[in-house]
UniProtKB/Swiss-Prot annotation:
PANTHER family: GLUCAN ENDO-1,3-BETA-GLUCOSIDASE BG1-RELATED-RELATED (PTHR32227). Pfam families: Glyco_hydro_17. Possesses beta-1,3-endoglucanase activity in vitro. May play a role in fruit pulp softening process. Can cleave beta-1,6-branched glucans in vitro. This is Glucan endo-1,3-beta-glucosidase. Monomer. Keywords: Allergen, Glycosidase, Hydrolase, Signal. Expressed in fruit peel and pulp.
Length: 340
């Protein structure tokens, strides 16, 4: 997870409502599995923990061979990242892309159920690797095609909400000029191949960046009524407003039929101000699980696939909140109770 850009949303005074229901299993929810810790359980135990908690999808940030081996015959669907260290070589060398797919995907398919390949995480627009994302995506797609897997496994890239130059109101959502230079052709690639755009969505960072304009209930899905009225669209939570701003931005560059997959979203349980608490983290993530099945005001009834960030608190990340997004401690005990 990189630093998230805040989104400016006009604030309103809100009342806090109470979470009143425990969700049943939601198939559209996954959890991100990071490994930046020196005390984490082995991948085989992690996969068992996913299964015992009815977590049906996993985001894996690099093709860790022990994790892929543990995922065999687990029925867990996998979003697999191409790490930034591989992006440039895969962009410039189709043979390298073929080798990458053979080694990390074909070798495990179909006993590992790959869903997406994410070429890079939050590398657009500011990274020096941004120019290599689309060529790498094309080479990975061609490698999947050679293996006959282009219809089963979709190729995309993960961006953060900093790619939005305009986000309020949501219907005015538009990519910044810097991001659009890269994203316009990427969106055309996604549209032509039926692939979604992967977006990391963090109402937490929007709230902490604009506490005078954004209320905590709006960020936590606990607002008691409509907060933002945007023409015919009514918004009661910030998550929907952010996702719909991305949909609007996609429409502006010819991506009206491109889906959005929320490749990261979460709330820290400690390490920041008072808003970083176990109570707020539980409330946000449980409400996210409850919410995604109903779509957004701009896409009502269309389930939003989302991945909670993240499975464990990781002690080798930067201090503060970065170490405290986990649903579980490294000893596999829950940081707080949550139901999938």
């Amino acid at each position: 997870m990189a630093t998230k850009a805040s989104l400016s949303i006009k604030g309103f005074a809100l009342l806090v409502s109470v979470l009143v229901a425990v969700p049943t299993r939601v198939q559209s929810i996954g959890v991100c599995y990071g490994m930046l810790g020196n005390n984490l359980p082995p991948p085989s135990e992690v996969v068992s923990l996913y299964k015992s908690n009815n977590i049906a999808r996993m985001r894996l940030y690099d093709p860790n061979q022990a994790a892929l081996q543990a995922l065999r015959n687990s029925n867990i669907q996998v979003l697999l990242d191409v790490p930034r260290s591989d992006v440039q070589s895969l962009a410039s060398n189709p043979s390298a892309a073929g080798d990458w797919i053979r080694r990390n995907v074909v070798a495990y398919w179909p006993s590992v159920s790959f869903r997406y390949i994410a070429v890079g995480n939050e590398l657009i627009p500011g990274s020096d690797l941004a120019q290599y994302i689309l060529p790498a995506m094309r080479n990975i797609y061609n490698a999947l095609s050679s293996a006959g897997l282009q219809n089963q496994i979709k190729v995309s890239t993960a961006v953060d909400t900093g790619v939005l130059g305009t986000s309020y109101p949501p219907s005015a959502g538009a990519f910044s000029s810097a991001a659009q230079a890269y994203l316009s052709p990427i969106v055309q690639f996604l549209a032509s191949n039926g692939a979604p755009l992967l977006v990391n969505v963090y109402p937490y960072f929007s709230y902490t960046g604009n506490p005078g304009q954004i209320s905590l209930p709006y960020a936590l899905f606990t607002a008691s009524g409509v907060v933002v009225q945007d023409g015919r669209f009514s918004y009661q939570n910030l998550f929907d407003a952010i996702v719909d701003a991305v949909f609007a931005a996609l429409e502006r560059v010819g991506g009206a039929n491109v889906a959005v997959v929320v490749s990261e979203s979460g709330w820290p349980s400690a390490g920041g101000g008072a808003e970083a608490s176990t109570s707020n983290a539980r409330t946000y993530n449980q409400n996210l699980i409850r919410h995604v099945g109903g779509g957004t005001p701009r896409r009502p009834g269309k389930e939003i696939e989302a991945y909670i960030f993240e499975m464990f608190n990781e002690n080798q990340k930067a201090g503060g909140i970065e170490q405290n997004f986990g649903l579980f401690y490294p000893n596999k005990q829950p940081v707080y109770q949550i139901s999938f």
